Amino acid sequence: MLSDIEITHLAKLDHISKIGAKLGLGEDDMELYGKFKAKIEPRLDGSNSKLILVTATSPTPFGEGKTTMSIGLADALNRLVKKVCLALREPSLGPVFGIKGGAAGGGYSQLAPMEDLNLHFTGDFHAITSANNLISAMIDNSLYQENPLNIDKILWKRCMDMNDRALRFITVGQGGKADGVEREDGFNITAASEIMAILCLATSLADLKERIANIMVAYNDRGEPIYVRDLGCEDAVCILLKDAMKPNLFQTIEHTPTLVHGGPFANIAHGCNSIIATKTALNLADFVITEAGFGSELGAEKFIDIKCRVAGIAPDAVVLVSTIRSLKYNGGADKESITKPNMSALEVGIANLGGHIENLKQKFGLNVVVALNKFGFDEDSEIDFVRDYCAKFGVKMAVCENFVKGGEGALELANFVLEELKKPNDMKFAYETSDDTKSKITKIATEIYGAGEVVFEEAAQKALEKIKKLGLEKLPVCIAKTQYSFSDDAKLLGRAKGFKFSVKDLQIRTGAGFIVAVCGKIMLMPGLPKTPSALNMHIDTKTGEISGLA
C-alpha cells in the first residue's frame, strides 16, 4: 500500500472555493490561503443539525485511529449524499518531527494536502505562540521596570511549537542588569499553552479578550494573584489572535468539507477543536463529526463537562472507536504480540470496551455505535466475538475498512449512525457546577473511572484551600492522567475498578475557566526520540515535493 503522503499526492483535490460552495459559502465568505485552504467568518446562530462525537477505548501506544475514523465516517455520509462537515483539531509541529508523524488521518481517509496541514497551515499556532510569549515579555519587562506589581512567584511560561526537552528548565536574563532580571523559566509546547485552550473555548472576540485578561500569571509578594489585566496587555494579545479566531476550511481526499481549528492537549486541557469551528460547522451542514482526544473517560468526559457546558451543545450520537489489538493489549498481551491471534487476551481485555460503553450510555446518557477499525491481521472469529459482546449492551458494531477503502469502507458505520440519530438522546453531566472542586474530582474518579478511593495529597489540599479562597469552586475540572488506563496507573489495564486514585496537585486556569487536577506526571514540553521522524523527511529541491512526512 502507498504511504500516506503518496496517497495525498495522487489525490485530485478540488479548489477550496468549490469545497466552500458545498456548505453554501461564496467567494466573499472565504479568505483564501492558496488553492486548498481558507479562513471563514464564524457563524454561531442556532441550528437543528446533528452532532456526532468520535471517541475511543483506552489506546495502545500506537493509537487506534480516531481521526482516520472521523474522516472515513464523514466521507461515507458524503457518499450517501448528506450535507456533512468535519470539525477537527490542528496538528502540532512537535509530534510531526518527533515520534508520531503527521496528524491528518491515514491511508485513504485523510485530509489533504497533508503537508499543508502538518506544516504551518494558516499560521494559527504561530499566532498563539506569539500571544503567549508577548505575555512572558510583559512579565519580564515589568520586573525590569522596577517591578511595580511586586511580582514574586511567576506561573506563566514561554512556549514554542516544537519538541525540545532542553527548554523545559532554563534561566533567562543572564546578561546582566541591561538584559533583564535573571530568573528561572521554561518552555511549554504551544498545544499546552493556556492561550490554546482559551482560543478553543472562546465564543467571540469579546469573550476571548475577557478570558485573556483573566489569565493568572503570577503571585505578588503578599500571595495575591496577578492577572494579564494587571499587566495591561489583554488588547495587544487579543490583536495577535484576531485572525486565528477564524476557522480554517480544508478538505478530505474525497472532497468532504472540513473545519480544522485549534489543538489543545487532551490532558492538561480539554482536547477538542474550537467551539467556534464546531458551532460554525453546525450552522453550515446537516451532519457534523468531531472528536475528543484519548479514550472516552478522558476526552468524551471533557467534551461533555467542559466544551458542551460552555457551548450549549450536546452530541446526538457517539462513535466509539476500538481495535482488536487494543483490546488484546488491555487483556495483557504485549506490544510485540498484539497482532497475533490471542483469544484469551481478547476475552480479558474486552472489559475495557464494556467500561467505555457503560460510561457513554449509562453515565452520560448517549446513543453509541462501536466502530471496529479493522486491520489485516484481525481474525474473523475475533471480530465476531467483539460484535456479540457489543450486542449484550444493545450496541451495534460496524467493521470499518476506510483506511484501505476510503469512505466506502465506512458505509456500514454511517448507516448505523444514521439509525442512532433517529433515537432520543438525553445527555447527562458527570457533576454539577454547584459541586465544590473536591466533589467534582471525586465524582469523575469514582463514577467514570471506577476508583474505590480518592486521595488528595498535601499540595492538592493546599490548592483546594486557595481555590475556595479565590471563589473559583464553580469552575469545571480537567483531570490530567494517563490515557492508557481508567486509573492513574498506566500499567493498570482492562477495566480497572476499586483502585486508589491520587490527586497530586491542582492548577488554576482562570483564563480557560477550569481547574486542572494533576494525577500523574505531566509533560508539557516533549522531547525528540532517538530516531525522530524528521530524519526520514526529504524535499526535492527542483520540484519542492516533500516525501517521508507520514
From Swiss-Prot:
Q: Name one GO biological process term.
A: tetrahydrofolate interconversion
- Pfam families under this entry? FTHFS
Name its pathway.
Answer: One-carbon metabolism; tetrahydrofolate interconversion
Q: Which PROSITE patterns match?
A: FTHFS_1, FTHFS_2
Kindly list the positions annotated as binding ATP: T60, P61, F62, G63, E64, G65, K66, T67
Keywords recorded for this protein, A-Z: ATP-binding, Ligase, Nucleotide-binding, One-carbon metabolism
Give all cystine bridges in this chain: none
Top-level taxon of origin:
Bacteria
Q: Which GO terms describe its molecular function?
A: ATP binding; formate-tetrahydrofolate ligase activity
- In the Enzyme Commission scheme, what number(s) does this protein have? 6.3.4.3
Task: Name the reaction it catalyses.
Answer: (6S)-5,6,7,8-tetrahydrofolate + formate + ATP = (6R)-10-formyltetrahydrofolate + ADP + phosphate
Q: Which family does it belong to?
A: Belongs to the formate--tetrahydrofolate ligase family.
Name it.
Formate--tetrahydrofolate ligase
